[in-house]
């Protein structure tokens, strides 16, 4: 319901890399699961309403790490590799990486 409401106003939702947001089970806290979150969001809202909202907070110390394969900003590309693996086009990945958010900020 919230995703649809944001879609209907032309907004975007950023996927969050914090392991507790990705999955309650530690072994499922992965870049692949994060991509599945994005796929669900795209199914509900359309990929033009999905963005990166990673919130890398590893500098806060233990307990604030990202999910496996996305522990810090140097691994952000793993999310996009996973999006490609599950069928997102190059144009959709580029939109999620930057274009969707830039559109809303304009």
Predicted regions and their residues:
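Mid-to-C-terminal alpha-helical segments outside catalytic/metal-binding sites
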Residues: 71-106
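Short basic/hydrophobic patches in alpha-helices and adjacent helix-turn junctions
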Residues: 40-44, 66, 78-86
